Amino acid sequence: MRYEIKGGSFPIVVCQLESGEQMITEKGSMVWMTPNMQMDTRGGGLGKMFAKAFSGESMFQNIYAARGQGMITFGSSFPGQIKAVEIGPGREMILQKSAFLAAEAGVELSIHFKKKIGVGLFGGEGFIMQKLSGRGMAFVEIDGELVEYELGPGE
């Protein structure tokens, strides 16, 4: 999969897929796609569907598969930026709720519960967040300006 992030306040990510490659996303993120992209919708099982409903996320996930070379574009739902992140062993990522935009099919999206009550009550993001694990490229939407910090172990 090759990609390019374009745009200003409401950016998009254009993904070029080879035959058989797949992308996952939650509802409402896809902007346009070539006719040879096939969409399937999955719930992920009753337990996962219940957990997603509890967290306020969509209970269903869309999977887009390329039947030959294809293109698909995903767009941000609010002003800000799109960031590409490589997910892999030791490179899992915890996101604020609703930050997940799209990912290659090898990336697993799940919910993450904060364990500290004070952080959940006063931290501004609540107790429920999103977790990306597995392996592949993921795209997250950042509301507002993106500032990056490189943290060391334990920070």
What kind of feature is each model-predicted range?
Residues M1-E155:
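Composition-driven recognition of glycine/serine/threonine/acidic- and proline-rich low-complexity segments
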